[in-house]
Amino acid sequence: MTNLCPCGTGKSFGECCEPLVTGARAALTAEELMRSRYTAYTRAEIGYIHDTTHPDHRADFDEKGTREWAESSQWEGLEILATAGGGPADTEGRVEFIARYRDTGGRRTHHELAEFRKVDDAWYFTDGYGIKPQPAVSTKIGRNDPCTCGSGKKYKKCCGA
């Protein structure tokens, strides 16, 4: 049985993110770097997370906080929602993603729009912006509206009674 890569591609770790996290090769795209950074979090490879942060932004890197978050979380999955740019021929890219994890407070999601820049053929993370969930929009059911259960009765005479 193969050890699947935590980044969610369905490939084995050895043929997916391991060569990037170990430094055997560089990421070819911003999305590939994003996936490998997520994998590094799941394995608490803080050195890789630091090294793939753009040099201009490393002064803001909190190694202790990053290590605590990585080690205290049970990583449950990565979902890439959208990418813009970030291809092999690009110099900038954005990746919107959701990382799911569990900590002492329960299940959590980290929804972010991450920005990447390529310098000398190497992709780097430059910044990330948290995306807040949109409030659920629901319509109020009127008492004289048809019941949502599909009975054909008015709501007030069915489930609203």
Curated annotation (Swiss-Prot):
Q: Which Pfam families match?
A: SEC-C, YchJ_M-like
InterPro entries per UniProt = NTF2-like_dom_sf (IPR032710), SEC_C_motif (IPR004027), UPF0225 (IPR023006), YchJ-like_M (IPR048469)
Q: Which Gene3D superfamilies has this protein been placed in?
A: 3.10.450.50
What family, per the record? Belongs to the UPF0225 family.
Q: What is this protein called?
A: UPF0225 protein GSU1048
Identify the species of origin. Answer: Geobacter sulfurreducens (strain ATCC 51573 / DSM 12127 / PCA)
